[in-house]
């Protein structure tokens, strides 16, 4: 008889900065900036988490982030931060709430200890392939610090009980509340120390058949692998030790914002622009956009009132992003200073296939591979990717500068599509999702002992 799988999250004694230091300690996640940027952002702030998550900045510029001394320096700094009282461990096992507000929209995450075995058995579901070298780098970091310094980002199906609990806390004064530099988003943080609330959270997660990794596949893999490794090395392993859990922030799926993740390509694979446009007509309806229907009512809740405007007028009045593809299977192409609409013809995709129906897959198969000869998005140097917040202006800039020949804008993937793919055991095509806002690091840390 197969045991019904369920999620086994638990509270933990978080390690975190005192209220008055949080803005000095907190940082962006390790993988959204390079060493030079981290060095510049840390500046002369010795309390910056970058000294732990980008520890190469503690050495001469040019020092490899994979140098053994660099990992050791992360552990030394983690010890130093605790000794100096810049990070302190809570006395009680508890949950935490982390909220982010972007453009007036707030998403509320529960910070939990996720169970390593739930990851190993596939109850925590992934949708991305991980690279062994990147896993190994994160594993070394977890091992040497003996902690999950940065959280991973999970989604769960909407849950009314948890939502009510979150809203109740949202009405109270947060422990941390600040606007982050650079992204300008608001970040708030509450401690859930009430025993009844802790029991409710644990019980509600236990009813869920699965959790979904949204962002942080390499960190999840590394945390789980180190946990499993420690279990093997401990002759008195019970399954209750802290290393059996890793830190995750879990958001309701409907609250998450996924932005478009667009493509820019260096050349047309030997074709002229006319030949390329002609080749597209096999699988797409190609429309030269010289005018666009714009909702000019100005009232989001009211009846939309569309007016046809010349493309240049629409852009000057509403900004370039007014052109973004409004529907699935519609794309925007920028080539030779002009914008084109591409609409995938019926029969070029399979609505029943959770992968084949994705615009990232349609564009990869029918444009990048079939016409442009780009087979592997991860390794081909002719293509690059422009995430979400930079908008269509960045696509136009990179083509107009001559660096790239063409740009392709896609409609964003939905959270439901990600969950469908994870449920079917399939893997998303590369460079498909761009979540925003990103989690800040340094608000909370989970020790493995």
Can you say where each PLM-predicted feature lies in the sequence?
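Surface-exposed, charge/polar-rich loops and edge strands
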Residues: 1-4, 8-449
């Amino acid at each position: 008889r197969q045991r019904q799988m369920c999620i086994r999250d638990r509270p933990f004694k978080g390690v975190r900065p005192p209220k008055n230091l949080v803005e000095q300690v907190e940082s962006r996640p390790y993988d959204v900036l390079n060493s030079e940027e981290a060095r510049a952002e840390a500046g002369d702030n010795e309390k910056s988490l970058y000294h732990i998550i980008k520890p190469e900045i503690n050495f001469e510029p040019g020092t490899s982030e994979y140098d053994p001394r660099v990992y050791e320096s992360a552990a030394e700094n983690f010890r130093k931060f605790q000794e100096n009282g810049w990070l302190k461990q809570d006395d009680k096992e508890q949950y935490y709430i982390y909220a982010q507000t972007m453009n007036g929209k707030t998403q509320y995450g529960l910070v939990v200890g996720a169970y390593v075995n739930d990851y190993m058995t596939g109850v925590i579901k992934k949708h991305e392939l991980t690279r062994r070298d990147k896993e190994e780098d994160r594993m070394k970091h977890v091992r040497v610090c003996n902690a999950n310094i940065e959280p991973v980002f999970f989604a769960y199906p909407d849950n009314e009980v948890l939502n009510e609990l979150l809203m109740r806390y949202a009405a109270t004064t947060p422990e941390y509340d600040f606007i982050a530099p650079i992204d300008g988003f608001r970040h708030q943080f509450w401690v859930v120390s009430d025993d009844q609330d802790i029991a409710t959270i644990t019980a509600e997660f236990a009813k869920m058949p699965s959790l979904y990794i949204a962002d942080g596949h390499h960190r999840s893999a590394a945390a789980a692998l180190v946990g499993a490794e420690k279990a093997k090395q401990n002759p008195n392993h019970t399954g209750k030790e802290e290393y059996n859990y890793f830190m995750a922030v879990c958001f309701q799926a409907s609250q998450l914002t996924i932005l478009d993740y667009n493509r820019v390509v260096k050349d047309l694979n030997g074709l002229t622009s006319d030949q390329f446009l002609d080749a597209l007509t096999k699988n797409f309806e190609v429309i030269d956009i010289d005018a666009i229907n714009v909702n000019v009512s100005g009232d989001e809740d009211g009846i939309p009132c569309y007016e046809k405007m010349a493309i240049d007028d629409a852009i000057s009045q509403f900004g370039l992003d007014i052109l973004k593809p409004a529907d699935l299977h519609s794309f925007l192409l920028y080539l030779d200073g002009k914008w084109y609409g591409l609409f995938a013809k019926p029969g070029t995709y399979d609505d029943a296939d959770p992968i084949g129906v994705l615009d990232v897959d349609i564009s990869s198969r029918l444009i990048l591979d079939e016409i442009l000869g780009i087979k592997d998005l991860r390794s081909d140097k002719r293509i690059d990717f422009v995430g979400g917040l930079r908008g269509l202006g960045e696509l136009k800039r990179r083509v107009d500068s001559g660096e790239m020949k063409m740009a392709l804008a896609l409609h964003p993937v939905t959270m439901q599509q990600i969950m469908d793919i994870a449920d079917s055991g399939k893997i998303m095509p590369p460079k498909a999702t761009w979540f925003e806002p990103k989690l800040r690091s340094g608000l909370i840390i989970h020790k493995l002992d």
